[in-house]
Every structure is written in structure tokens, then in C-alpha cells.
Amino acid sequence: MSWLPVESDPGIFTEIIQQMQVKGVQVEELYSLDFNSLDEIRPVYGLILLYKWRPEEKENRVVITEPNPNFFFASQIINNACATQAILSVLMNSSSIDIGSELSELKQFAKEFPPELKGLAINNNEAIRAAHNTFARPDPSSIMEDEELAAAKNLDEDDDVYHYISYLPVDGILYELDGLKEGPISLGQCLGEPEGIEWLRMVQPVVQEQIDRYSQNEIRFSLLAVVKNRKEMYVAELKEYQRKRERVLQQLGALQADKYAEKSSYEALDRELSEVNIGIETVSQKIVMEEEKSKNWKKENMRRKHNYVPFLFNFLKILADKKKLKPLIAKHHP
């Protein structure tokens, strides 16, 4: 079974990750690279830049052809799999992510492989391919005649080709991972923890330079972030606020029983309780927003999984049989 093209969408990629049994991770689309935007979505495991591919000039930067054996770099073997492979590059190289049994076994199996064989190992992994193909665009070839299929293939040849590059810190080094290159590219030593802000400060100008270059050439692009599951984070934060609230209430109760307690102590605890209540309200709203977003993603993903092509094909065929199709086309395209 081949790898089929999928739409670039954070909801799709999040569900693909979940189907690969990876826990506690989701994908978000970034609309700004300013530090406040990056800081708000931490921890960020990796950034993925999507752009319309064009032949580039010769690479002058040093490509690491023999990376650390624990570093997972795979050559891009199948074009339609490049989005999933870019996500895998982040997942496989992030020690703080629970990648599940399927990816763990693949990582161990391909550990000593060169990049080309790692790419083939991904290509031949049925579980990953099945998760990817769940969101494949409907294939009209199953209902088309030979002439129609040939025409469709000719149209497909003119389709835009999109490419993905991953950026992430590994063992104190910031890397750029491009499956079309021979190996990873080191962008320099990166201080701080992988889940901190330091590597994001370092990668920001690198990605911004790429985006500016694409913008000048009118090349379409988008930026994705592989991040910790937001709802799980907020639920943990809410529980911490609730525990803090209980402690403050207990302290207030103890003060009420102490007739020698100072007024300033009451006031300090009241302020703290007020801050905690505001925190609880804020985090609760964030949880609701994440639940709503997840619900919308699931709704959209169900719509994407449905194949509307047979219905549309038969509908147009009925119109043609009744001699109504050509008049409609002529009316809207005189």
C-alpha cells in the first residue's frame, strides 16, 4: 500500500500522533514568531516549517554525515510521507516524550541504519503508514475510466509540491533536519533545557530568515509546533491551584481560631486566596477552550475521512445524462 497525500493541518497531525500511540503531545500552528507567542506554548519539542518546494542553491553549510547513533535522522524516501516524517524527526529525538511501543521498537530496530535505510524502515512500517493514510485525500481513480484517470494524473503533475523541515534541540545542540539532505545540520550549541525558552530564542532568527526569503519569492509556507498536550498541562495546573486553595483555606481557618492573630495576616491570606481563585478561573477557561478546539478538530477530521468523490461523481454523471451539465458549466463559465 502506498503513502497518500494528506492536508497540512494541526488537527490532522495531532490525531496521527495519537494513532501512533504517542502520549501527551499535540501540534499547533504558529502565526507569529515573537518570543511571547513562543513562550505561551512551551514546552515546545520542535518546530516544523512547511513551504512550497523549489530547487534550491547548493548547500554551503556542513552536513553531519555520521551523527550520534542515538540521533534519529531518516532520508526522505517518499514525498507524500514528508509531513509525517518531519513529525517523527521531532518525536524520535525528544527524550521527554513517551513515543509508545511502536515507535520505540522502530527506533531501536533502525538505530544502526544509515539515513537511507531509516527512511525505508519508516516507509515499510505498516502502523505509521496506516495512521498517515487515515487522512489521505480521496482517490478519484477508483471510479474513473482510463481516459479520465489519465487526465487527472496530468493535472496532478502540476500540483504544488510542499516540503517540511524540522528544528529541535538534541543533547545541547540545535539541529535542522531536512530529509532531502544527507544528514542533519548543526545550528550551534544550545544552552538550557530542551523544554526551555533558550533554544526557541536561538531558532527564532533562523526560521524568520527562511520565512522572509520565502515571502520575497512569494512561496507559501506555514509553521507548526510540536508541543505538550495543552489540556493535560492545564488540568495539572488546575489541580495545583486547587491544592493551594485548600492550604490557604486551612490557614485562614487556623487564623480564625487564633484570637491573637494579626489583621495583616488575614489580609495577606485574603490576597493570596483572591489570586488563587483568579488562577483557577483562568485555567478553567483554558481547559474549556482546549476541549472546544479538540471537539472541532474531531469534527473536521471526521469530515476529511469521508470520501465525497463517489457522490459528486455520480451527481455530475446524472446531470450529464439529463443534458443539464453542459448548460450549467456554460452558465458559470461563459
Swiss-Prot record:
Its main location: nucleus. InterPro entries: Papain-like_cys_pep_sf (IPR038765), Peptidase_C12_UCH (IPR001578), Peptidase_C12_UCH_sf (IPR036959), Ubiquitinyl_hydrolase_UCH37 (IPR017390), UCH_C (IPR041507). GO terms for cellular component: cytoplasm; Ino80 complex; nucleus. GO terms for molecular function: cysteine-type deubiquitinase activity. It holds the Pfam family Peptidase_C12. GO terms for biological process: protein deubiquitination; shoot system morphogenesis; ubiquitin-dependent protein catabolic process. The keyword Transcription regulation does not apply. Residues 2-228 form the UCH catalytic domain. Residues 307-334 form the ULD domain. It is found in: Nucleus; Cytoplasm. Keywords: Cytoplasm, Hydrolase, Nucleus, Protease, Thiol protease, Ubl conjugation pathway. Disruption phenotype: No visible phenotype. Uch1 and uch2 double mutants are less fertile, accumulated less chlorophyll and have slightly fewer and shorter cauline branches. The record marks 178 as: Important for enzyme activity. Its EC number is 3.4.19.12. The active site is at residues 82, 163. PROSITE patterns: UCH_DOMAIN, ULD. It is an enzyme of class 3 (hydrolase). Signal peptide: none annotated. It catalyses: Thiol-dependent hydrolysis of ester, thioester, amide, peptide and isopeptide bonds formed by the C-terminal Gly of ubiquitin (a 76-residue protein attached to proteins as an intracellular targeting signal). Belongs to the peptidase C12 family. Heterodimer. Interacts with EER5. Interacts with UCH2, DSS1(V), DSS1(I), RPN3A, RPN3B, RPN12A, RPN12B, SAC3B, CML20 and NUP1. UCH1 and UCH2 are not integral polypeptides of the 26S proteasome, unlike their S.pombe and animal orthologs. However, they interact with the 26S proteasome lid complex as well as to the TREX-2 complex. PANTHER family: UBIQUITIN CARBOXYL-TERMINAL HYDROLASE, UBIQUITIN CARBOXYL-TERMINAL HYDROLASE ISOZYME L5. Ubiquitin-protein hydrolase involved in the release of ubiquitin attached via both peptide and isopeptide linkages. Able to cleave 'Lys-48'-linked polyubiquitin chains. Involved in the direct or indirect regulation of AUX/IAA proteins stability. Acts as a linker between the TREX-2 complex and 26S proteasome. This is Ubiquitin carboxyl-terminal hydrolase. The gene is UCH1.
